[in-house]
Amino acid sequence: MAQSLTKIYIHLIFHIKTTSPNIIEKDLPRVHTYINELINVCGCTALKVGGTENHIHTVFLLSKDEPLSHVVEEIKRKSSRWIKNIDPWYKDFAWQSGYGAFSVSQSTVDKTIAYIEKQREHHKKRTFKEEYEEFLKLYEVEYNKEYFIRD
């Protein structure tokens, strides 16, 4: 083939370290906007960034030129450093080392975006741990419970 063509949507989820301060509600829009910019700088196309005070959800179109692990590393490393400079409250801010990345079909991208937009509502009914376990079960991802949501 003369061209390398891809269209891979990713739903990425990552959580703060348990020893890290939560992201203050008023700062969430700025954090989401910055992460959106980082995704685009990595050559990907950010469609939605959202989440709550302790975790992030984003859906984006993965660049054909960048491996997912590199994109995630850049997003987490640069956003962590940036968040620490917002306010002294965040001096010990850090993301956990792990993450969940799940493929999203073209037909469910809008549904995934809507899900991310309603994070506040979802977490009135269930914890992050419950939500994340649902994703792992849905995608049939095997994981070690000993290291689940651990720094």
Please report, for each region that a protein language model flagged, where it lies by residue.
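Basic nucleic-acid-binding interfaces
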Residues: 1-151
